[in-house]
Regions:
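Charged interaction segments
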Residues: 23-133
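Short, extreme N-terminal segment that most often corresponds to the first beta-strand
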Residues: 1-27
Length: 133
């Protein structure tokens, strides 16, 4: 089954197009049909300025070509002075990772940061208690 994570990324619309192009080029250079995460988003919201997207319950491992393509693409956005926000929540309570870049270009500024809540799932615990009674 493996360890799973939830991932959220925020870019400008221009940044999303650049990331998409970069990831496609990155994966095509591997000379095999690799799964493109950007073609398989589980979550996407956008407005006139920004795109907020991500995946739930994903194997986000270094060394997976699809993951490396996204991470390399975010570094590419940084190199091109394009803002982004990245957050990953792992299964373990203390497993949280984030990265971001704020462009000096006014058109690329003021992106929201991903927001997360961790909370108790009381209904699950109560159901399990009732099940074993």
């Amino acid at each position: 089954m493996g360890y799973r994570s939830d991932v959220r990324i925020m870019t400008t619309k221009k940044g999303f197009k650049e990331l998409n192009k970069y990831v496609k080029d990155y994966l095509s250079k591997l000379n095999h049909d690799e799964y493109n995460l950007l073609d398989n988003l589980e979550f996407k919201a956008e407005n006139d300025y920004a795109v907020y997207f991500g995946w739930n319950w994903l194997k986000w491992y270094d060394g997976y070509d699809s993951v490396d393509a996204i991470e390399s693409g975010l570094n590419h956005l940084r190199d091109k002075d394009m803002s982004f926000r990245f957050a990953r929540i792992g299964e373990s309570y203390d497993d949280y990772e984030e990265d971001s870049y704020e462009s000096e270009n006014e058109e690329e500024q003021d992106l929201e940061y991903p927001s997360m809540n961790r909370e108790f799932d009381d209904s699950y615990v109560i159901e399990e208690m009732e099940r074993v009674s």
